[in-house]
Amino acid sequence: MKLTCMMIVAVLFLTAWTFVTADDSGNGLENLFSKAHHEMKNPEASNLNKRCAPFLHPCTFFFPNCCNSYCVQFICL
């Protein structure tokens, strides 16, 4: 019983250690928190306020803004 508990604790510790020490080249959490803080100060900067293009409306390949579809040849499909 004690060995099982020790194994569970060891696995949980190693899993947490893997996530903590993982190489995040984009500083994901740091960028996430700073972005959230910026959106609280400026609500217009939130992604929820951005509009998307409906089906068969124009879009750009590099910055697609289609709602629930893909941008194919500058049209939301």
From Swiss-Prot:
Its main location: secreted. Keywords: Amidation, Cleavage on pair of basic residues, Disulfide bond, Knottin, Neurotoxin, Secreted, Signal, Toxin. Residues 23-49 form a propeptide. It is found in: Secreted. GO terms for molecular function: ion channel inhibitor activity; toxin activity. GO terms for cellular component: extracellular region. Residues 1-22 form the signal peptide. Disulfide bonds join C52-C67, C59-C71, C66-C76. Pfam families: Conotoxin. Expressed by the venom duct. The modification Cysteine amide is found at C76. The presence of a 'disulfide through disulfide knot' structurally defines this protein as a knottin. Belongs to the conotoxin O1 superfamily. This is Conotoxin King-Kong 2. It comes from Conus textile (Cloth-of-gold cone). The lineage of its organism: Eukaryota, Metazoa, Spiralia, Lophotrochozoa, Mollusca.
